[in-house]
Amino acid sequence: MLQATGVILAGGRSRRMGQEKALLEVGREAMIRRVAGVLKEVFAEVIISGGVEENGLRLGLRVVPDLIAGGGPLSGIHAALCGAAFAKCLVVACDMPFICPELARYMMEQSEGYDVAVPRHGQHLQPLFAVYSKGCIRAIEESLRAHKCKVIDFYPLVRVNYVSEENLRALADIEVAFFNVNTPSDLVKARVMAENSRTGRVWLV
């Protein structure tokens, strides 16, 4: 069990989905419950950032509200870092139903000596499956005050390890692990992916 905090980011408005995503079921289980189950395998503390209090009650987890409103996911990361019991947090979006413990542990290892460890995935980064330390708090606050609300906007102000895609692929099928559910068609695809897995969870062990 890692002495760190797993954070489920659940405060999004889900405009493209048209309803709250956290409670939508994939593999006969709410997405937020799937994510929580994986994080509980790895982290000594698991919390929810944003979203409704009922989600925390269902899962027996503490919900931390935004302290600086209007910054989207960056506000959620800030609230989580301020409220976490440990110095480092792995932040995971609630709409990533196929994350795996192996990647979570590896990302924590890759955060040693850095304020942020973020995966590369193709031409993009995965800032909502990334490790952030409490050393980021001031930089995030500075970014939010300047209305720079993309998660990666504060990265130039801190020490960042951009984790190679090749190393991640050695641990898991990252096309599956990083699949996120934004639209109704994504939800259909995720349910098919889960159904095609005997365990209801699609990852490489």
UniProtKB/Swiss-Prot annotation:
It is found in: Cytoplasm. GO terms for molecular function: GTP binding; metal ion binding; molybdenum cofactor guanylyltransferase activity. Mg(2+) binds at D95. SUPFAM superfamilies: Nucleotide-diphospho-sugar transferases (SSF53448). Its cofactor is Mg(2+). GO terms for cellular component: cytoplasm. Its EC number is 2.7.7.77. Keywords: Cytoplasm, GTP-binding, Magnesium, Metal-binding, Molybdenum cofactor biosynthesis, Nucleotide-binding, Transferase. The keyword Ribonucleoprotein does not apply. It catalyses: Mo-molybdopterin + GTP + H(+) = Mo-molybdopterin guanine dinucleotide + diphosphate. GTP binds at L9, A10, G11, K21, D66, D95. One of its GO terms (biological process) is bis(molybdopterin guanine dinucleotide)molybdenum biosynthetic process. The keyword Signal does not apply. Belongs to the MobA family. The N-terminal domain determines nucleotide recognition and specific binding, while the C-terminal domain determines the specific binding to the target protein. Transfers a GMP moiety from GTP to Mo-molybdopterin (Mo-MPT) cofactor (Moco or molybdenum cofactor) to form Mo-molybdopterin guanine dinucleotide (Mo-MGD) cofactor. This is Probable molybdenum cofactor guanylyltransferase. The lineage of its organism: Bacteria, Bacillati, Bacillota, Clostridia, Eubacteriales. The gene is mobA.
